[in-house]
């Protein structure tokens, strides 16, 4: 490491995965599941160092003997003891960096409750002794990573989706929409519809297989009804998938029926509006003078926006809803799975950002509420 500048650490805490790395890098060094596992029957795990908790991939591989918990639900931290375990694992096992030596940039969900932001700040300064930290809204970082400061971000991950209108770098809270429908729901829906085909996936290990099928084979139809008709008349859309045990299964119209739920949440028994309508409603809540800039800069972010065909379909559906004179542009950056992290890496490397950090001195003077004055 160069002496001239201490590198900041960037940690994007998602419901499904933690993305962590060093500011200035173009991709996170570490991506691991946001899970903490504790032994089901403490004291009987022979030959294992008596650990009271396992984090990430290690928890995943030992899941047969553990009770797994996700401390981040729908984008919001709900279990602070487990969250602290995840951060500890991130610093010491994944990044192998001493937190007391680096400024730390954390990310938060849009509309994160005030108490949560204070708790994050407190844990960083008091448990990890960081010299400085900052909390940034995930969608804002995604927009930065696309090279924009104005636009609307549709951020859809594993636990939650949001539409976040941003003007000149600031999120507009009154117009943010949250949709509790994301990757985990789509994986569960795919399990259900594969069941109808006679493939029984039920355990948590099998759920991981279905997630892989989803990521490798699913796509979004431009016109759902036509795609259904086509799939009934030909077997062109059928693909085979080899299971870990060597068996091969065939996946047909499930390939596009699964992610269609993003546009038709009623498939999952949810009353919510689809992502196209949610984006449109979010824009409608904004001042009429900035709507043109939002319609022309609809930026996709998060792993659940990775489906082939999503850009074309969103463009089509939003064009149908919007005023006819409006130019609609959907931007789908290829690296959007990690664009929140990349935006954090960019932001924390800027020379102009260096005065934005909350320092240990400021924290000691003002306490956790300093986060509301410095991070917005």
Swiss-Prot record:
Signal peptide: none annotated. Its EC number is 3.6.4.-. The keyword Hydrolase applies. Its main location: cytoplasm. GO terms for molecular function: ATP binding; ATP hydrolysis activity. It is found in: Cytoplasm; Nucleus; Cytoplasm, Cytoskeleton. ATP binds at residues 15-17, 19, 158-160, 214-215, 303. It catalyses: ATP + H2O = ADP + phosphate + H(+). Disulfide bonds: none annotated. Pfam families: Actin. Residues 40-61 are annotated as: DNAseI-binding D loop. A potassium ion appears to reside in the active site during hydrolysis and leaves together with the inorganic phosphate Pi. K(+) does not activate Pi release; however, it may be relevant for ATP hydrolysis. ACT1 and ACT2 differ in their polymerization, filament stability and helical structure. Unlike mammalian actin, Apicomplexa actins do not form long and stable filaments. Monomer (G-actin). Oligomer (F-actin). Polymerization of globular actin (G-actin) leads to a structural filament (F-actin) in the form of a two-stranded helix. Unlike for mammalian monomeric actin, parasite monomeric actin is able to induce oligomerization in the presence of ATP or ADP. Mg(2+), which is used to coordinate ATP, is required for polymerization. Interacts with MyoA. Interacts with DNase I with low affinity. This is Actin-1.
């Amino acid at each position: 490491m160069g002496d001239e500048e201490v590198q900041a650490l960037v940690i994007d805490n998602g419901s499904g995965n933690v993305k962590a790395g060093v500011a200035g890098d173009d991709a996170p060094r570490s991506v691991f599941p946001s899970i903490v596992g504790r032994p089901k029957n403490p004291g009987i795990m022979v030959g294992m160092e008596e650990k009271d908790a396992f984090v990430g991939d290690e928890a995943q591989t030992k899941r047969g003997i553990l009770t797994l918990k996700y401390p981040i639900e729908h984008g919001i931290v709900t279990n602070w003891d487990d969250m602290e375990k995840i951060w500890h694992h991130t610093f010491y096992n994944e990044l192998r960096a001493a937190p007391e030596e680096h400024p730390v940039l954390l990310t938060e969900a849009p509309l994160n409750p005030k108490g949560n932001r204070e708790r994050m700040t407190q844990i960083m300064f008091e448990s990890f002794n960081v010299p400085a930290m900052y909390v940034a809204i995930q969608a804002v970082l995604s927009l930065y990573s696309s090279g924009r400061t104005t636009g609307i971000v549709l951020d859809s991950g594993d636990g939650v989706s949001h539409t976040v209108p941003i003007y000149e770098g600031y999120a507009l809270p009154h117009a943010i929409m949250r949709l509790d429908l994301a990757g985990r729901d789509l994986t569960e829906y795919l399990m259900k519809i594969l069941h109808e085909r006679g493939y029984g996936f039920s355990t948590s290990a099998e759920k991981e297989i279905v997630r892989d099928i989803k990521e490798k084979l699913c796509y979004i139809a431009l016109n759902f009804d036509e795609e259904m008709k086509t799939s009934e008349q030909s077997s062109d859309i059928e693909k085979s998938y080899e299971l870990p045990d060597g068996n091969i299964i065939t996946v047909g119209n499930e390939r596009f029926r699964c992610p269609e739920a993003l546009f038709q949440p009623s498939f999952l028994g949810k009353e919510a509006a689809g992502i196209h309508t949610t984006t449109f409603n979010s824009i409608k809540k904004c001042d009429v003078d900035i709507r043109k800039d939002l319609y022309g800069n609809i930026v996709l972010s998060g792993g659940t926006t990775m489906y082939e065909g999503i850009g074309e379909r969103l463009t089509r559906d939003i064009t149908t809803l919007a005023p006819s004179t409006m130019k609609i542009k959907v931007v789908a950056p290829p690296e959007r799975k990690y664009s929140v992290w990349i935006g954090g890496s960019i932001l924390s490397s800027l020379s102009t950002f260096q005065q934005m950090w909350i320092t240990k001195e400021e924290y000691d003077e003002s306490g956790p509420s300093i986060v509301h004055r410095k991070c917005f």
